[in-house]
Amino acid sequence: MFARYLPPSAEKFPAQFKEKDALITPWRILPISILYNTELLKADEAPKSLEDLLNPKWKGKISIPDPSRHTTTAKFFWNLEKLMGAQWREYVKGLAKQQPLLVESLAPVTPAIIKGEVQVGIAYIKFVKQYKGPVSYVSLNKYLSDPNHLALGAKAARPNAGRLYIEFAVSAEGQKMIAQDGEFVLAPGVFPPIQGAEKVTPNMIPMDNPSEDEAKSLSNEFRQIFFAKDLGLPLDLEGAVET
Protein backbone atom coordinates (compact mmCIF):
# COMPACT_ATOMS: atom_id res chain seq x y z
CA MET A 1 0.00 0.00 0.00
CA PHE A 2 2.80 2.42 0.93
CA ALA A 3 6.31 2.81 -0.45
CA ARG A 4 9.26 3.11 1.89
CA TYR A 5 10.50 6.70 2.04
CA LEU A 6 12.37 8.50 4.80
CA PRO A 7 12.58 12.22 3.99
CA PRO A 8 16.00 13.64 4.95
CA SER A 9 14.49 16.38 7.11
CA ALA A 10 12.70 13.81 9.28
CA GLU A 11 15.92 12.14 10.39
CA LYS A 12 16.22 14.62 13.29
CA PHE A 13 12.69 14.02 14.55
CA PRO A 14 12.37 12.53 18.07
CA ALA A 15 12.91 8.78 17.93
CA GLN A 16 9.66 7.90 19.75
CA PHE A 17 7.62 9.39 16.90
CA LYS A 18 9.45 7.71 14.02
CA GLU A 19 8.12 4.60 12.33
CA LYS A 20 10.77 1.88 12.12
CA ASP A 21 9.72 0.70 8.67
CA ALA A 22 9.75 4.27 7.23
CA LEU A 23 6.44 3.64 5.46
CA ILE A 24 4.80 6.64 7.12
CA THR A 25 6.30 9.93 8.28
CA PRO A 26 4.94 12.07 11.15
CA TRP A 27 4.36 15.71 10.24
CA ARG A 28 2.50 16.97 13.30
CA ILE A 29 1.42 15.70 16.70
CA LEU A 30 -1.69 16.66 18.64
CA PRO A 31 -1.18 16.87 22.43
CA ILE A 32 -4.30 16.72 24.58
CA SER A 33 -4.84 18.64 27.80
CA ILE A 34 -7.51 20.31 29.92
CA LEU A 35 -8.83 23.54 28.41
CA TYR A 36 -10.65 26.12 30.53
CA ASN A 37 -12.57 29.40 30.21
CA THR A 38 -10.27 32.22 31.35
CA GLU A 39 -13.18 34.54 32.13
CA LEU A 40 -14.84 32.03 34.43
CA LEU A 41 -11.67 30.66 36.02
CA LYS A 42 -8.34 32.11 37.01
CA ALA A 43 -5.31 29.98 36.19
CA ASP A 44 -4.93 28.93 39.83
CA GLU A 45 -8.61 27.94 39.97
CA ALA A 46 -8.42 25.58 37.01
CA PRO A 47 -7.79 21.85 37.51
CA LYS A 48 -4.11 21.03 37.91
CA SER A 49 -4.30 17.48 36.57
CA LEU A 50 -6.63 15.03 34.87
CA GLU A 51 -7.33 13.53 38.28
CA ASP A 52 -8.55 16.92 39.51
CA LEU A 53 -11.47 16.66 37.10
CA LEU A 54 -12.96 14.09 39.48
CA ASN A 55 -13.37 16.75 42.18
CA PRO A 56 -17.11 17.14 42.87
CA LYS A 57 -16.89 20.89 42.16
CA TRP A 58 -16.49 20.11 38.44
CA LYS A 59 -19.65 18.00 38.24
CA GLY A 60 -21.72 19.19 35.29
CA LYS A 61 -19.03 21.69 34.28
CA ILE A 62 -16.91 19.49 32.01
CA SER A 63 -17.17 18.71 28.31
CA ILE A 64 -15.63 15.71 26.55
CA PRO A 65 -16.39 13.90 23.29
CA ASP A 66 -18.60 10.83 23.57
CA PRO A 67 -15.98 8.03 23.82
CA SER A 68 -18.48 5.41 22.67
CA ARG A 69 -18.62 7.13 19.27
CA HIS A 70 -15.47 9.24 18.97
CA THR A 71 -12.51 6.97 18.29
CA THR A 72 -9.77 9.43 19.28
CA THR A 73 -11.33 9.98 22.70
CA ALA A 74 -11.71 6.23 23.17
CA LYS A 75 -8.05 5.88 22.25
CA PHE A 76 -7.13 8.67 24.69
CA PHE A 77 -8.89 6.95 27.58
CA TRP A 78 -7.36 3.58 26.65
CA ASN A 79 -3.89 5.14 26.57
CA LEU A 80 -4.39 6.59 30.05
CA GLU A 81 -2.88 3.29 31.17
CA LYS A 82 0.47 4.87 30.27
CA LEU A 83 -0.15 7.51 32.94
CA MET A 84 -2.40 5.79 35.47
CA GLY A 85 -1.69 2.10 35.10
CA ALA A 86 -4.56 -0.29 35.80
CA GLN A 87 -6.56 2.50 37.45
CA TRP A 88 -7.42 4.11 34.11
CA ARG A 89 -10.80 2.37 33.91
CA GLU A 90 -11.77 3.57 37.37
CA TYR A 91 -10.78 7.06 36.27
CA VAL A 92 -13.09 6.89 33.26
CA LYS A 93 -15.93 5.65 35.46
CA GLY A 94 -15.30 8.54 37.83
CA LEU A 95 -15.36 10.99 34.95
CA ALA A 96 -18.70 9.60 33.77
CA LYS A 97 -20.14 10.26 37.24
CA GLN A 98 -19.25 13.93 36.76
CA GLN A 99 -22.07 14.15 34.21
CA PRO A 100 -19.95 15.72 31.45
CA LEU A 101 -21.44 17.46 28.44
CA LEU A 102 -20.82 14.90 25.70
CA VAL A 103 -20.16 16.23 22.20
CA GLU A 104 -19.44 14.49 18.91
CA SER A 105 -15.68 15.15 18.71
CA LEU A 106 -12.82 17.14 20.22
CA ALA A 107 -13.52 20.25 18.13
CA PRO A 108 -16.89 21.22 19.74
CA VAL A 109 -15.41 21.05 23.24
CA THR A 110 -13.65 24.40 22.84
CA PRO A 111 -16.71 26.40 21.66
CA ALA A 112 -18.66 24.97 24.60
CA ILE A 113 -15.94 26.29 26.92
CA ILE A 114 -15.76 29.69 25.21
CA LYS A 115 -19.56 30.12 25.34
CA GLY A 116 -19.58 29.28 29.05
CA GLU A 117 -21.72 26.17 28.60
CA VAL A 118 -19.03 24.44 30.66
CA GLN A 119 -15.94 25.69 32.46
CA VAL A 120 -13.43 23.02 31.45
CA GLY A 121 -12.97 20.25 28.91
CA ILE A 122 -10.57 17.75 27.40
CA ALA A 123 -9.33 18.75 23.94
CA TYR A 124 -6.31 19.45 21.75
CA ILE A 125 -4.04 22.24 23.00
CA LYS A 126 -3.88 23.67 19.48
CA PHE A 127 -7.48 24.88 19.81
CA VAL A 128 -6.23 27.62 22.14
CA LYS A 129 -4.74 29.24 19.03
CA GLN A 130 -7.30 28.11 16.48
CA TYR A 131 -10.42 29.36 18.30
CA LYS A 132 -10.97 32.99 19.27
CA GLY A 133 -12.22 33.48 22.79
CA PRO A 134 -11.37 33.24 26.50
CA VAL A 135 -9.67 29.84 26.52
CA SER A 136 -6.34 28.53 27.76
CA TYR A 137 -4.90 25.13 28.68
CA VAL A 138 -3.58 23.46 31.81
CA SER A 139 0.12 22.59 32.00
CA LEU A 140 0.42 18.87 32.75
CA ASN A 141 3.41 16.70 33.58
CA LYS A 142 2.77 14.53 30.52
CA TYR A 143 0.54 14.89 27.47
CA LEU A 144 -0.98 11.97 25.61
CA SER A 145 -0.58 12.97 21.98
CA ASP A 146 -1.88 11.80 18.61
CA PRO A 147 0.70 11.75 15.77
CA ASN A 148 -0.48 12.41 12.21
CA HIS A 149 1.43 10.95 9.27
CA LEU A 150 2.12 11.35 5.58
CA ALA A 151 2.85 8.41 3.29
CA LEU A 152 3.89 7.76 -0.30
CA GLY A 153 1.61 5.41 -2.20
CA ALA A 154 3.31 2.27 -3.49
CA LYS A 155 1.71 2.85 -6.88
CA ALA A 156 1.73 6.65 -6.87
CA ALA A 157 1.36 8.14 -10.37
CA ARG A 158 3.99 10.79 -9.59
CA PRO A 159 6.19 9.40 -6.80
CA ASN A 160 8.82 12.14 -7.11
CA ALA A 161 6.17 14.82 -6.59
CA GLY A 162 4.97 12.90 -3.54
CA ARG A 163 8.47 12.74 -2.11
CA LEU A 164 8.95 16.47 -2.65
CA TYR A 165 5.67 17.25 -0.91
CA ILE A 166 6.49 15.08 2.10
CA GLU A 167 10.01 16.48 2.33
CA PHE A 168 8.70 20.05 2.29
CA ALA A 169 6.09 19.32 4.96
CA VAL A 170 8.75 18.03 7.35
CA SER A 171 11.47 20.54 6.41
CA ALA A 172 12.31 23.40 8.77
CA GLU A 173 10.47 25.84 6.50
CA GLY A 174 7.41 23.65 6.14
CA GLN A 175 7.26 22.86 9.85
CA LYS A 176 7.45 26.57 10.73
CA MET A 177 4.54 27.31 8.40
CA ILE A 178 2.46 24.51 9.92
CA ALA A 179 3.31 25.57 13.48
CA GLN A 180 2.08 29.12 12.88
CA ASP A 181 -1.48 27.77 12.83
CA GLY A 182 -1.11 26.40 16.33
CA GLU A 183 0.07 22.95 15.34
CA PHE A 184 2.72 21.11 17.32
CA VAL A 185 5.36 19.78 14.94
CA LEU A 186 8.40 17.55 15.27
CA ALA A 187 11.20 19.70 13.86
CA PRO A 188 13.60 20.52 16.71
CA GLY A 189 13.15 24.03 18.09
CA VAL A 190 9.94 24.79 16.18
CA PHE A 191 6.89 25.60 18.33
CA PRO A 192 3.40 27.02 17.77
CA PRO A 193 2.64 30.56 19.03
CA ILE A 194 1.07 29.22 22.22
CA GLN A 195 2.39 30.23 25.62
CA GLY A 196 4.47 27.44 27.16
CA ALA A 197 4.51 25.35 23.98
CA GLU A 198 8.23 24.70 24.36
CA LYS A 199 7.47 22.94 27.67
CA VAL A 200 4.74 20.80 26.12
CA THR A 201 6.78 19.25 23.32
CA PRO A 202 9.37 17.43 25.51
CA ASN A 203 6.58 15.87 27.56
CA MET A 204 4.42 14.46 24.77
CA ILE A 205 3.70 10.73 24.85
CA PRO A 206 2.51 9.21 21.55
CA MET A 207 -0.71 7.25 21.85
CA ASP A 208 -0.94 3.67 20.63
CA ASN A 209 -3.77 2.62 18.32
CA PRO A 210 -6.11 -0.14 19.46
CA SER A 211 -6.80 -2.97 17.05
CA GLU A 212 -10.16 -3.09 15.28
CA ASP A 213 -11.47 -5.62 17.79
CA GLU A 214 -10.13 -3.61 20.72
CA ALA A 215 -11.77 -0.46 19.34
CA LYS A 216 -15.15 -2.19 19.12
CA SER A 217 -14.76 -3.50 22.65
CA LEU A 218 -13.84 -0.04 23.92
CA SER A 219 -16.86 1.51 22.22
CA ASN A 220 -19.16 -0.98 23.92
CA GLU A 221 -17.44 -0.56 27.26
CA PHE A 222 -17.67 3.23 27.18
CA ARG A 223 -21.31 3.05 26.09
CA GLN A 224 -22.02 1.02 29.19
CA ILE A 225 -20.05 3.36 31.45
CA PHE A 226 -21.60 6.58 30.17
CA PHE A 227 -25.10 5.47 29.14
CA ALA A 228 -26.07 2.15 30.75
CA LYS A 229 -27.82 3.86 33.66
CA ASP A 230 -29.91 5.94 31.26
CA LEU A 231 -30.72 2.82 29.25
CA GLY A 232 -31.66 0.84 32.33
CA LEU A 233 -28.91 -1.73 31.70
CA PRO A 234 -26.54 -3.34 34.22
CA LEU A 235 -23.01 -1.96 33.97
CA ASP A 236 -21.51 -5.45 33.69
CA LEU A 237 -23.55 -6.38 30.60
CA GLU A 238 -21.00 -6.71 27.81
CA GLY A 239 -21.72 -5.72 24.23
CA ALA A 240 -25.44 -5.34 24.83
CA VAL A 241 -26.02 -2.07 23.02
CA GLU A 242 -25.30 -1.59 19.33
CA THR A 243 -25.95 1.51 17.20
Task: Name each model feature, range by range.
Residues 1-117:
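Extracytoplasmic ligand-binding site segments that recognize negatively charged/polar headgroups
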Residues 32, 40-42, 60, 68-72, ...:
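Solvent-exposed loop/turn segments at secondary-structure junctions
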Residues 33-40, 147-161, 177-178:
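A bilobed periplasmic-binding-protein/Venus flytrap-type ligand-binding module shared by bacterial periplasmic
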Residues 212-243:
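Conserved C-terminal helix/tail region of periplasmic/extracytoplasmic solute-binding proteins
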